[in-house]
């Protein structure tokens, strides 16, 4: 039976560290960290995600500055809102909640966010910093995956790792982080021939394909660590991931559940990026570097 990579429990432990960091540095900083979440439109899933982030902020003492614009908002107004948040001295982290309504190009809007306030780690400058091994905000989901592996003593160094999916949101930064941890990394995707031949050789498999139940027992070698980034609503109710967990659990050494795996750590890493940015702005020390390496 696979070890459970419990993202919910780890997120709670990291939140405790963040809360202690805030309490320690608040007298010198003079104000709490601030996270602004910009939501455009009325996507129901986005509303739930934003509410979860606001609750997480409240738990650890981060001030939350939400902004909600109607779906009819023109590009120029969304851009202006981002620029206002860039200039707001209370705000240390900015998140543009995706997806955006049809007709709004997310690329230029993400690039308009001040790289030092880029709570999601998606700005081109911060992806470049990741590539070069420099300090900066890290992409939240991949950073959360790395923290989950480390928390269970799973060291990628010298291991074969396969990342399924090549999105800029997860797949590509995930591959860079695993490489930085000295894994030998292969990225596979929808055009890859003989997917099983690649995944069956892997010691670590990160599945971020966005396809429900894509990965089963035939893809995984015995003893591998499997991280399921996918989350989908099943027609009959409930949630599932990209991995057929019932098949994989008996043969994997470790498996992240859905829900309760990567999702909670994605939110927590958003807070880590925000708190670290706050510390840097005020010239105070922090002990969170292990979460961003």
From Swiss-Prot:
Q: Which GO terms describe its molecular function?
A: methenyltetrahydrofolate cyclohydrolase activity; methylenetetrahydrofolate dehydrogenase (NADP+) activity
A GO CC term attached to the entry: cytosol
**Which reaction does this chain catalyze?**
(6R)-5,10-methylene-5,6,7,8-tetrahydrofolate + NADP(+) = (6R)-5,10-methenyltetrahydrofolate + NADPH; (6R)-5,10-methenyltetrahydrofolate + H2O = (6R)-10-formyltetrahydrofolate + H(+)
**Which residues of this UniProt protein bind NADP(+)?**
165-167, 190, 231
The alphabetical list of record keywords is: Amino-acid biosynthesis, Histidine biosynthesis, Hydrolase, Methionine biosynthesis, Multifunctional enzyme, NADP, One-carbon metabolism, Oxidoreductase, Purine biosynthesis
* EC numbers for this chain: 1.5.1.5, 3.5.4.9
Q: What is this protein called?
A: Bifunctional protein FolD
Q: Record the organism.
A: Synechococcus sp. (strain CC9902)
Q: Which gene encodes it?
A: folD
